[in-house]
Amino acid sequence: MKYILFSMAFIFLFTNCKKEDKQDPLLSQAKCVDINNPISISINDLITDIDTIGLEVTDSSLLGDIHMLHIMNNKLYILDTKGNAIYIFSRNGDFIRRIYHVGQGPEEYIRINGFQVDYKCNRLILTDSFSKRIFIFDEYGELLKVVPLKFSAYILMARNGGFLNFYTGPKQMYGLKDMENYNIHVLDSCGNFVASFLENQTPHRIDLESTERIDYNPNNEEILFHPTFGNVVYRIDKNNQIYPEYVFRNKSSFKLLTPKERREMTHIYGQKNEIEEKESEGYLLSWGCVYDLDDYCLFTMTGWNHPKHIYYNKSTGISVTIDMEKMKGDVSLCKLFNAPIYQTEGNCFYNIIPLYLVDELADKLPEGKLKTFLQNNNTPNSNPLIIKYKMKFPE
């Protein structure tokens, strides 16, 4: 019955919202996020409440290439794509365990493509697109279940006894047209396809993979989903009803894609890159990077080479555009914080600082705790470092 209700909600939504127009009934209930020209601000005034986490180094916990970070029950879960493993650390960085089940056996994976945490059931959901399976572990790293799939999955969340699969990556991934033409797929507990929702607005081939197109709020069990190049961000509530939550309203000198331009967008790896072309023409382009904090939302217009942040205050409805490349203040701080955001918690952001950047900036930062932390961990055998911080909303 939940799947039927979910389907009916989508039918109603998309018969009434064929255009991204604020006159449409459901879109009129969405919150407007104004895109303005970037503000002039110093990095020293923007970044506050900096804290640091050093990850313990042992023979079993030396990390190579951190791809994803999740936090659950005071534990850090890190996907290392080079090591093909999930590493579990305490919140202060003490090593707990490594999940490494590589092989050809029935309880072994070939390669971890992505993982999410199931806050409600305290589980880890790992996806292996090569063997087309889901691996479910408890919060301590014990394998609970392996679920076979008929397709390759990248971003997949446990939901109401089943799963939600979010389309990401190149086109023609699925044998079913009902999956290929839609962004979100409902699966039952056995991994079988049940229904699809939210029609794909980028039907041309887009060889892009973003792990940040969704953000889950464990406090209210709601998901924010931002379709590739979309101007609308959707909310999926705990009953699997979907609504437009935010609509971008352009008041800047940048351009946003029209629905027609979005349908015609193409990115074929090594052949055609309309993302870079459009960015050079002044377009803001998002692959769907959305971060839902307690009091704010951050939308990252990733683009190709020059990302921009749209920082939205939930209580006032005011938004500011931040261009980290044109930030004022200390140059080394600007470079340190002009990095991908890996996780949020409360009103805090978590960034991973790779060792090459630690080596480059350790002696250049302003005197203080942050500089000392980088200097003390600037050794060949250190792990990448984690920085936790807040962004002060500009007055």
Where are these regions (language model features)?
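Repeated scaffold domains used in trafficking and secretory/extracellular systems
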Residues: 65-68, 110-115, 151-159, 206-214, ...
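Blade/loop signatures of beta-propeller domains
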Residues: 21-56
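Beta-strand-rich domains and repeat architectures in extracellular enzymes and scaffolds
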Residues: 50-84, 288
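Short coil/turn segments at the loop-to-beta-strand junctions that recur within blades
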Residues: 59, 100-107, 148-155, 200-204, ...
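Blade-loop segments of beta-propeller domains
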Residues: 56-61, 65, 94-121, 128
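Short beta-strand elements that form the blades of beta-propeller/WD-repeat-like
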Residues: 75-80, 122-128, 161-175, 215-234, ...
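Conserved blade-ending motifs and adjacent loop-strand segments that build the rim/top face
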Residues: 203, 245-261, 316-346
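Asp-box/WD-like beta-propeller blade repeats and closely related beta-sheet repeat scaffolds
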Residues: 129-181, 196-203
